Amino acid sequence: MTNLQRFKNRKALITGAAGGIGSALVKALKKEGALVAITDLNTSNVDADANFDGDLQNSQFCDELPLLAKDKLNGLDILCNVAGVITRGNINEVTDEEYNLTMKVNVEAPFRLCRASIPIMKKGSAIVNVSSCWGLRSGPNHPLYTMSKAAIASLTQSLGLDHAHQGIRVNAVCPNEVNTSMIRSGFEVRGLNPDKAIEELNKTIPLGRIAEPEDIVDVILF
């Protein structure tokens, strides 16, 4: 396959870079010539041009990260908010701690990162926020997760309207099931074998399989 180099010398910041979608996105961007800064709790196993280990629950870290990435890469053209957590259980089962974690990582962190990135971005820059199909149409027993992803979908629309005149594109990607540790952990919590559960789930998909991280990356890069 031809290496298109669509992102040659573009500077990108990716959150959740140690996860399934995040790590695949880092590889794809670097393959196409981008300079990539990344963050996660531990990024030691991810090859990037700038690694910033940190906790997205830390507001100051989120506020400062885009400028740190810009200084390290000599610019910032792309922000991809990929990091996320999922909390399972109905409203009477989830705790205040789980609420705070979900809102901090899934909503406040992307908000702060977008707010800090936009002033230092030039015309032609892009922001991609990873929401979820459940952010558009809710599913059962995940009120915290679905609420947080709906917030990100709404935030994305607002930012797209507010900053189009600056030539900054803001889009959301809303995946369904993706073969990552997040979905596998859900099967484990329910006492299911993740591999067998995914095999059964694959049978419900017209293509014969759920999405792989690389499928979502293709959409993000578009």
What are these regions (language model features)?
Residues 94, 138-146, 158, 186:
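Active-site loop-to-helix junction immediately N-terminal to the catalytic Tyr of the SDR YXXXK motif
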Residues 114, 148:
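Active-site helix of classical SDR
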Residues 119, 161-165:
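Alpha-helical segment proximal to the catalytic Tyr-Lys
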